[in-house]
Amino acid sequence: MATQTNQDHFSGDLRRSWQKIGKLTYGSRQWIVMMASRSAVLKKMLESDEFKTSAKQVGTITLLEMKQEELEAFVEFLYSDGSMLSSKVKQHARALYRAADKYEILRLRELCRSELISSLNSTNSLNLLELAQIPFDKVLNDAALSYIKTNELMFPSFDEFKLFVDNYPNLAVEVMMASLTRTPSTSCSRCGLITYHNQTGTSCCSCGFDYPRRS
């Protein structure tokens, strides 16, 4: 029988905690030391009088803002060497990006930001642009805005876009101007990539496939 790792043991306890009380908690001494070493914010929480003198759950910290799978991915990263994101952690990059900012885990934030930028597409670019605003992340903001300015954008529902306009009117104007002035694009019949024609307007700028000239 394979030996259970600390991470496996922890994930199992998280799962049982979720099933029993509907929230995710953990309080072993090893976990506390590990969490405190990775995050200055968590360290302050763990050293607070409220944490130390909790009447009901002595030595337990509760993270309610993450769902079960997100928290398990969060823990997986904390137990790793921090050099890269696993496939499981990548699945929750957006939630962990927020958590990394809240708990000031800079390496996790950097890796999640890179993953989000690499995943930019026509359906999520506006959401990622909004994500970059609070707190402001210039790298993610510039990447999302650059994508929007040079690629087709699929707008969300009217209500979602209206909320975006209300919250970020200047950004909304910039997004709309980009949509109005963007060079028309099409899907290449050879490579399938939604891309722009080259300067002559007769071939795909990705694979070079020649299109008939427009009349």
UniProtKB/Swiss-Prot annotation:
Gene Ontology process terms (BP): protein ubiquitination
Entry note about domains: The BTB/POZ domain mediates the interaction with some component of ubiquitin ligase complexes.
Leader peptide range in chain numbering: none
Coiled-coil residues: none
Record-annotated BTB domain positions: 17-87
Function: May act as a substrate-specific adapter of an E3 ubiquitin-protein ligase complex (CUL3-RBX1-BTB) which mediates the ubiquitination and subsequent proteasomal degradation of target proteins.
Organism field: Arabidopsis thaliana
Keyword Hydrolase tagged: no
Name of protein: Putative BTB/POZ domain-containing protein At2g05330
Pathway, per record: Protein modification; protein ubiquitination
PANTHER family for this protein: BTB/POZ DOMAIN CONTAINING PROTEIN, EXPRESSED-RELATED (PTHR47274), GENOME ASSEMBLY, CHROMOSOME: A05 (PTHR47274:SF15)
Keywords on record: Ubl conjugation pathway
CDD domains in the record: BTB_POZ_ZBTB_KLHL-like
SUPFAM superfamilies assigned to the protein according to its UniProt record, in alphabetical order: POZ domain
